[in-house]
UniProtKB/Swiss-Prot annotation:
Organism superkingdom: Bacteria
Protein name: Small ribosomal subunit protein bS16
Keywords for the protein's UniProt record, in alphabetical order: Ribonucleoprotein, Ribosomal protein
Family: Belongs to the bacterial ribosomal protein bS16 family.
Organism of origin: Borreliella burgdorferi (strain ATCC 35210 / DSM 4680 / CIP 102532 / B31) (Borrelia burgdorferi)
Chain's gene name: rpsP
Length: 86
């Protein structure tokens, strides 16, 4: 079982927000998550992204793979994304 850290779409039509979650890589996009690590609001102007960095580091150390979108969001928001290479 491969585990990924990726986005789960929530919200209303034309007003999306996303939860940053840990999921089995074969689960559907909006399927059941193992753990929720934070959120991302692309429509909001302030406080767009919040992530529990300690939990993310823990999952990465256990072998979870970051999706390309999550990597891009971490780099764009200057969050501690250098632990991706573990």
């Amino acid at each position: 079982m491969s585990v990924k850290i990726r986005l789960k779409r929530m919200g209303a039509k034309k007003r999306p927000y996303y939860r940053v979650v840990v999921m089995n890589s074969t689960s559907p996009r909006d399927g059941r998550a193992i753990e929720e690590l934070g959120y991302y609001h692309p429509v909001e102007k302030q406080n767009q992204i919040k992530i529990k960095e300690d939990r993310m580091k823990d999952w990465i150390s256990k072998g979870a793979i970051l999706s390309d979108t999550v990597k891009m969001l971490l780099n764009k928001n200057n969050l501690n994304a250098k632990s991706q290479e573990v």
